[in-house]
């Protein structure tokens, strides 16, 4: 559920949204794909998610697909900001980087386990003007902040009360 939440829990760096970059004429040359780790895919019984996605996405775009796996310990990935700078869209199963992409104005296609799900487009929207319609990014980000809690908020009941409100409404 997407609720109206104040920005009192939203960090300052997430309050400054960059201009929206969606639409078929946006010059991003790649579709940046953020697959989950193997244990994560296995836990959700989605072990073939990346393979299915790569075969399906080509029906909707001719752009290059850039796959950014989670960096392994001791391994280095290209800088996130440089990869995002060339992205026409970001596709994520459940990565928090999808929120960063939204903040930076890049459209996201997210699956149900992703914090950016409420601002998600569909694969069919790639290379169409549907991506020009900016989601309510501020509302989505503020809402996400009410799904994360500090230890004392579990002790004082705020986490439970807020979780029930998130699930069932007030």
What are these regions (language model features)?
Residues 63-108, 113-115:
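Donor nucleotide-activated moiety binding/catalytic core segment of transferases
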Residues 23-28, 58-62, 82-86:
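Flexible, charged surface loops at secondary-structure boundaries
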Residues 37-39, 114-117:
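Short loop/turn segments at secondary-structure transitions that flank enzyme active sites
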Residues 56-60, 115-118, 133-136:
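Glycine-rich loops and low-complexity Gly/Arg-rich segments
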Residues 34-39, 44-81:
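Catalytic donor nucleotide-activated moiety binding site of glycosyltransferases and closely related
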Residues 1-28, 43-44, 119-170:
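Leloir-type glycosyltransferase catalytic cores
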């Amino acid at each position: 559920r997407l609720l109206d939440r104040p920005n009192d829990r939203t960090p300052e760096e997430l309050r400054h949204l960059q201009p929206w970059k969606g639409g078929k004429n946006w010059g991003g040359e790649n579709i940046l794909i953020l697959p989950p780790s193997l244990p994560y895919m296995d836990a959700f019984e989605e072990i073939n998610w990346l393979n299915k996605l790569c075969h399906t996405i080509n029906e909707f775009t001719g752009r290059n697909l850039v796959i950014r796996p989670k960096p392994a310990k001791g391994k280095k990935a290209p800088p996130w900001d440089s990869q995002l700078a060339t992205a026409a869209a970001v596709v994520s199963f459940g990565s928090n980087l999808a929120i960063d992409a939204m903040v930076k104005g890049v459209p996201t296609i997210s699956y149900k386990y992703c914090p950016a799900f409420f601002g998600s487009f569909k694969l069919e929207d790639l290379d169409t003007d549907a991506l020009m319609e900016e989601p309510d990014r501020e509302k989505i980000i503020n809402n996400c902040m009410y799904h994360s809690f500090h230890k004392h908020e579990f002790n004082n009941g705020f986490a439970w009360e807020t979780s029930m409100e998130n699930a069932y409404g007030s």
